[in-house]
Amino acid sequence: QVTDTNQKGFLYKTSIVETSRAILGVRVLVGLPIAAVAAFIGSIFNAILVPSPVAGDVLAFTVRMAVIGIFASTGGLIAWFNLFESKRGAVLVWIVAAAGGLLGALAGYYIGDRYIDHPDVYILNQRLSQAVLFGAALGANAMATLLAIAAARWGRKRVT
């Protein structure tokens, strides 16, 4: 844009789309490893306090996946906490990311269970745990990313 002053000057504006992509990239790059570490802490919490599921105990299995998802979303929230300008917005991001963490943990479990070669139970549990933790971290950040894209699309920076 050319300004109409004594001298011709150009105002340079950065594209909102390019800035948004860069910010999203940084948020995911920061949020993913922190969410993975937090999911690992959640698995330690599970080992201490949540009863181990027996075969067919869907409730205990779901609780363990939910705990890992909640821990992953809480860790990933470090990268996403200021997405909105209100406390309700931060809570919304956390809830959406927690749902994503739960879905990601479940997806990681079922994908890992199907495709991980398991010569013995110990190796299966190690690799399956890694798949669940990464799935929770990825799911939490993916849902937060979708929320950020939706908020940018609708021009919402404040959740009332």
Task: Give the residues covered by each predicted segment.
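N-terminal signal-anchor transmembrane alpha-helix
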Residues: 4-68
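Alpha-helical membrane-associated segments of multi-pass integral membrane proteins
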Residues: 25-27, 31, 40-43, 115-160
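Transmembrane alpha-helical segments of multi-pass membrane proteins
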Residues: 30-34, 90-109
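Transmembrane alpha-helical segments of multi-pass membrane transport proteins and ion-pumping complexes
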Residues: 36-44, 72-77, 101-113, 140-145, ...
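Interfacial non-cytosolic loop connecting adjacent transmembrane helices
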Residues: 48-64, 105-136
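Canonical alpha-helical transmembrane segments
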Residues: 67-90
